[in-house]
């Protein structure tokens, strides 16, 4: 039996390219995805903006200021969530951005490692946590190194190949380790209210 898909929304990239994209839902598993997906070779251009908040430390406009205030609150909540499963140890943040979460973890006594594909954000993260343990890929980390906790905060929706990525992350997790994943909830109230203008798209 063939998998059936349903056209959901047409959304626009107002930040960088101005392009529009179709969001399609799998009727079987309810996964919502961009169709067609941008080619891997072209994906980086959608993040090449000084206004892409996750890759910047600048606070030049109201949106950035609000984002930073909210981020301070969420960082504490994230650490509290992790402490329910692990009190301390090693942690890898996949898609660490400019390293704010890693810095919070480091101050709490964790051994921190980050993975970030964007060179500029990676450099900022390394300076922020005063460590060389910020890598462009999991493949750059020592072959046998595994972690007590792996986090991926709103990263997987940006990944081109989902299953292989999760498989790679699982290989880096200790046997009794914890993996925490957060993705946008397209069934949320704000998603249903704002529809194609929702920030999660």
Locate each region found by the language model:
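Pocket-edge positions in alpha/beta enzyme catalytic cores
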Residues: 14, 67-70, 142
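Acceptor-substrate binding/catalytic loop of class I
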Residues: 20, 198-201
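Conserved SAM-binding loop
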Residues: 74-195
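Charge-dense, low-complexity intrinsically disordered segments
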Residues: 20, 65, 69, 156
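N-terminal juxtadomain amphipathic helix
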Residues: 1-60
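Conserved class I S-adenosyl-L-methionine
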Residues: 40-85, 104
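Short, flexible, mixed-charge acidic loops at enzyme active sites
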Residues: 46-51, 189-197
